[in-house]
UniProtKB/Swiss-Prot annotation:
Keywords for this protein: Antibiotic, Antimicrobial, Bacteriocin, Secreted
Task of the protein: Has antibacterial activity against the Gram-positive bacteria L.monocytogenes, L.lactis subsp lactis and L.curvatus H28, but not against the Gram-positive bacteria L.curvatus CWBI-B28, L.brevis and L.plantarum or the Gram-negative bacteria E.coli and Pseudomonas sp 55. Has no antifungal activity against S.cerevisiae, Penicillium sp BKS-TAN2 or A.niger.
Broad class of the protein's primary localization: secreted
UniProt-recorded name of the protein: Bioactive peptide 1
GO biological process, one term: defense response to bacterium
Location(s), subcellular: Secreted
GO-annotated cellular components: extracellular region
Length: 12
């Protein structure tokens, strides 16, 4: 399963 990045790492 792919790991989802935490909100503070969601640099879009």
């Amino acid at each position: 399963t792919p790991v989802v990045n935490p909100p503070f790492l969601q640099q879009t």
